[in-house]
């Protein structure tokens, strides 16, 4: 085998038994949604999952939190969770120090460089870039890529059933199923939480792709016949679930770029047996994984036909698409290709596990009877999301929590300012304040020679088109320079509108429309997960309803340690006193509550 950094593993549960308990909890409650409402009973066990002491206030887990009443909806992990996740971060400074399959590492680094927004004269080309893994990448890869223990003697099955004297609660049932199966080592459950723009996608993709390649190499070592049979098997090996079709496209595009990157096996350090494997025709030169996206408007036949041709290594889709398979009445066993899914990622999990999604998400995961790793990934931990996690995974041996020291902190490289539209020269007009801000951005001397790009957030989709019309008709912006996106746009329309904002800024000379500025007006639809590459300017026209949405909106800029600025426009209705303290909180690196 290739040299790897081995770590000890903490084990999770078996999906079949767990989701059986999930179904029991539904029947007991009489309502599906009631089972996930985060009831307070059993809270002490839930707190153990997060390392908190139920007798102490939650605020003791962090030094300083910027919060304001009901607006603050972010959960603060305990000091214990932070310490476990942060241990050894400073000792890792290169991707070579992490347990990543060699060809996956080569493809990952090349893909990250290919999308990097070059700035300043320091580097002449992207080949000169020296990339370092981000804290979430270090923490996640070290935990998720730990080799599985062959024997786990920490939990004995007789210990699980011993001492029961009364009827167990729903939480006890779920917890018991986890404990029972720990000795069988079937499933490990991870949560990843890190600040926006911190490299979470590659934190889980590098782990996922490494596991797929390690599995292939393991089969090849045991039997070339088994290896060939596995490649031809009619099955899906792993699934990445995201809440929107825009994110389906984004994750799929990242995978496809990495999958197509060429590399020289001779330059990849490997022992003779691994090198022999990498020189196989189907392994040599690129990752050559079978990657499938199943998005909006695509028929079930696309999934079925692809699986019939052989193994799908990674399926990128939404829970809704997979749930739709249950409605097929003319197809025999529509979920049969998913019976052997071993790895599943829930990206933007706080959305996928909220009350409006969980009845779709959980039954889908229940179909993955052979699941080994479940990775639950999010940029924020809303309090309601944490309550849901506590109910599903109530003890510290049922889940592995991974967070970064900067979770819920807004990046210091973002400059935040507040404009009071009640003051002169705006005289109560927020749109006039917006127009003035856009005018100033075009003339501020930043990004010389490049098309400036600005994202403007409003609270209601009805406000999107009216604001676009106002900027065009009243403030003389060119129609081609101001774009509105709402949920009513078709996926292909959204993709076309997003194009200028999800790729590096073009030079003014190269822009086909000769634009100096492009403005995207949208709602929270575009605030989560979308990787706006190199966006420097975000304007929040309407203050969001809670701190969770504020963090996500601000997080569309300042990604991957690049600079950005955020302008909040307020009026007498929304000029909350605490807003004036936000810029200083960002400078000081204080967590949002």
UniProtKB/Swiss-Prot annotation:
InterPro entries from the UniProt entry: DEAD/DEAH_box_helicase_dom, Helicase_ATP-bd, Helicase_C-like, P-loop_NTPase
Domain Helicase ATP-binding per the UniProt entry, residue ranges: 181-399
Keywords: ATP-binding, Helicase, Hydrolase, Mitochondrion, Nucleotide-binding, RNA-binding, Transit peptide
EC primary class: hydrolase
Classification via Gene3D superfamilies: P-loop containing nucleotide triphosphate hydrolases
Ranges of Polar residues composition bias in the record: 52-63
Motif Q motif: where in chain: 130-137
Protein name, entry field: ATP-dependent RNA helicase MRH4, mitochondrial
Gene giving rise to this polypeptide: MRH4
